[in-house]
Amino acid sequence: MVDHARARKMADRIKEIVARKLDRGIKDPRLGFVTVTDVRVTGDLQHASIFYTVYGTDEERADTAAALKSATGMLRSEVGKNITARLTPSLEFILDGVPENAAAIDALLEEARRRDADVQAQAKAGVYAGDEDPYVKPRVIGEDEDDDDEEGDEDGDDVDRSAPGYEPAH
């Protein structure tokens, strides 16, 4: 049976242990500015995926990935000493793509703002294609605009009986 609360607690504990060990315990010069962003533990508590970001170039990211891979055994033993579980989960380090995705989204939002500003500038300089007020005004009863109702049909239905195709209803 999967206990999600226990898996979440273990993930939080692993995140804290690994971050502390990376900050103070590993002396590998290849490790750059590493930040542990998230840890996910499987429901059976056998595997932990550790997401991290690295501040720096692609080469520094690759060096940091190699340093983390070489330190995985030591980090796993440190996790095993500090958690209360029968088995120590295996650790997998995954480079987190959130910062790059966030930068791409920020660039897209900036482009959208620029385009919106361009559209607003064009709208201010634009003129109406037709009348300025395209809406039909309601007729006021009592105006003498249409006098042909008085001389129209006897039955008052305003049907043009001389129109082509007109057939009277039977």
Curated annotation (Swiss-Prot):
Monomer. Binds 30S ribosomal subunits, but not 50S ribosomal subunits or 70S ribosomes. Pfam families: RBFA (PF02033). Residues 143-158 have a biased composition (Acidic residues). HAMAP family: RbfA. It comes from Clavibacter sepedonicus (Clavibacter michiganensis subsp. sepedonicus). GO terms for cellular component: cytosol. Keywords: Cytoplasm, Ribosome biogenesis. Residues 123-170 are annotated as: Disordered. The keyword Cell cycle does not apply. Belongs to the RbfA family. This is Ribosome-binding factor A. GO terms for biological process: maturation of SSU-rRNA. One of several proteins that assist in the late maturation steps of the functional core of the 30S ribosomal subunit. Associates with free 30S ribosomal subunits (but not with 30S subunits that are part of 70S ribosomes or polysomes). Required for efficient processing of 16S rRNA. May interact with the 5'-terminal helix region of 16S rRNA. It is found in: Cytoplasm. It comes from the Bacteria. The gene is rbfA. GO terms for molecular function: ribosomal small subunit binding. InterPro entries: KH_dom-like_a/b (IPR015946), RbfA (IPR000238), RbfA_dom_sf (IPR023799). PANTHER family: RIBOSOME-BINDING FACTOR A, CHLOROPLASTIC-RELATED.
